[in-house]
Amino acid sequence: MARSNRCVPQNSSIVQIPIEEVFKTQLKSRWQQITMSSASSPPPPQVFVPEPLFSEPPPPPKAPVNVSLSPPPPPRSPSTSTPPRLGNRNPPPPASPSGQEPTTPTMTPGFSLSPPSPSRLSTGAVVGISIGGGVFVLTLIFFLCKKKRPRDDKALPAPIGLVLGIHQSTFTYGELARATNKFSEANLLGEGGFGFVYKGILNNGNEVAVKQLKVGSAQGEKEFQAEVNIISQIHHRNLVSLVGYCIAGAQRLLVYEFVPNNTLEFHLHGKGRPTMEWSLRLKIAVSSSKGLSYLHENCNPKIIHRDIKAANILIDFKFEAKVADFGLAKIALDTNTHVSTRVMGTFGYLAPEYAASGKLTEKSDVYSFGVVLLELITGRRPVDANNVYADDSLVDWARPLLVQALEESNFEGLADIKLNNEYDREEMARMVACAAACVRYTARRRPRMDQVVRVLEGNISPSDLNQGITPGHSNTVSVRLDARAVRVKPHGEMDSRWGRFKRTAQRYGGDSL
C-alpha cells in the first residue's frame, strides 16, 4: 500500500488521511462483520468499571485503523472510537508522510480488555483474614493463660487433692506456708500426738488453724482423703468446722476454722489466769458434751474422736465450747464391734481398755470426757506433774471422793477450792454424777453421751446413768472402787473406808469405777 506524502499540520485538530478506495471498502466490510458478530453473540461478563474509560491515558498506538488522527490529549468524543484489534488479521497501519507512527485513540466496543478492579475481592479477603486471625489470637491467648497459671513456691512439693465440698476447698502447700509465716514458732498454737497446730491468715483475711500432721504417717493418700471427705460433711455449732486440706508429697495438713478465745486448758490451768466461775464451767461442760454426742449419735457411721482433752476444747468469746481436732478421728464402721488401732491420745485421758489393748469404741471417748468433767470440778490437771497428790492420775485421786460426794452431798473435798463454795449444789451434784459414771472401769457400764447431755441440762435424773438399774429406783450412782487404786494409798484411812465403799456398791449392784 502506498503511503501518502502529505504532511499533517501540527496545529490542526483533525487531519484526514486520504487512502485508496479499496482499503476503505475492506475496512467498512470488516467493521460490519465485527458489529454483527458482537450483536449475535452473548455479551461478555461485566467485569469492568466504565467510569475510568476517559480518565485513563490512551494505550500506545498499535492498531491505527481509525481514519482520523488526533494529537494528545485524546479526544473525549465517542465518535473517534475504533474497533479493537483483531490480531494478525488487522491491516497494517498507514504511515504518515513524515515517517512517524500515527497515534491511535482508545477503542471501546462495549467492553474493556484491562484486568478487573480488585476492590471488592480485597475487602472480602481482608474481612475474612481479620476474623480468622482474631479467633486464632483469642484461642492462643486462652491456652497460654491456662497453661501459665501462677504456681506457689516451686521449691515446695506440688499439691495434690480433690475438692471436698461446697463449703470446703483444697489448699496448696505454698498457700498454707505463707498463711502461717512458714510455720513459724510465733504462729504455733499447740502440739499434740498427731502433729502441730498453727494460726494462719489466708489471702482473703480469714483466720484459720492449720494442723500439720507428723510426717511418716502410715496413712495413705486415699485413706486420708476418704476420712476427710466424711468429716467435711459434719456441721454442728459445738464442733470446729473443717475448712479444707492439703496433700503435698508426704505432707498432710488440715485447715480448721479459728476459734479466737483459746482452749479450756488455757482458761482452767493457765498460769496467772483468773478463776473460772462455776456458771462458765457448767456452760462449757454442756456445750462440749453436745458436740461429742453429735459425733457418736448423729453421724453415720459414728465418729470416735480418740483424743478428747481440755486442750482440744476451744472456747469462743461467749464461752461456748467447740470440740476440735476430730479430723483424725477413727470412723467406726460397725457399731457392734470395737476398732483395734494403734493407741493415740494423751496420757491421763486414755480409757483403761484402750491403753492396754488398743480396743477402741465410743466409750473410750466417754471415759476421756469424764476426765474433762473432773478437771472442771476440781480445777486439777489430769496428771500430777508436781506430785501434789500421791496418785498417778486425777481419776485415781478422785475415785473415793466421788462416792463420798454422791452419798453425802459433800463436795468440799472434791470441788475446786478456788471456787470458795460459790456454786449451785444441784448443778454440782449432776456434774459429779456424770463424771463418776463416765470414768467407770468397765467400758460397757459407761453411759452414752446423749445421756450425759440430758443429765447436765437437768432433763433426766442422775440415776438414769446407771446401767442395769431401773431408772428412778436409785438415788445414788452405784459405784465400786477399784481395790488397786485405793490400796496404793499410803494412808491407812483410805483402807479403813474401803469397807463402806464396797458395801455401798453391793447394795446398789453397781460396777467398778
UniProtKB/Swiss-Prot annotation:
Superkingdom per UniProt: Eukaryota
Sequence positions bearing Phosphothreonine: 172, 341, 346
Positions in the Extracellular compartment: 1-123
Residue(s) carrying Phosphoserine: 340
InterPro entries: Kinase-like_dom_sf (IPR011009), PERK1-13-like (IPR047117), Prot_kinase_dom (IPR000719), Protein_kinase_ATP_BS (IPR017441), Ser-Thr/Tyr_kinase_cat_dom (IPR001245), Ser/Thr_kinase_AS (IPR008271)
GO CC terms: plasma membrane
Species this protein is from: Arabidopsis thaliana
Transmembrane parts of this sequence: 124-144
Subcellular location: Cell membrane
EC number: 2.7.11.1
Binding positions for ATP per the UniProt entry: 189-197, 211
Keyword Lyase: no
Family: Belongs to the protein kinase superfamily. Ser/Thr protein kinase family.
GO MF term set: ATP binding; protein serine kinase activity; protein serine/threonine kinase activity
Catalytic reaction equation(s): L-seryl-[protein] + ATP = O-phospho-L-seryl-[protein] + ADP + H(+); L-threonyl-[protein] + ATP = O-phospho-L-threonyl-[protein] + ADP + H(+)
Signal peptide: none
Protein name in the entry: Proline-rich receptor-like protein kinase PERK3
Cited PANTHER family: PROLINE-RICH RECEPTOR-LIKE PROTEIN KINASE PERK1-RELATED, PROLINE-RICH RECEPTOR-LIKE PROTEIN KINASE PERK4
SUPFAM superfamilies associated with the record: Protein kinase-like (PK-like) (SSF56112)
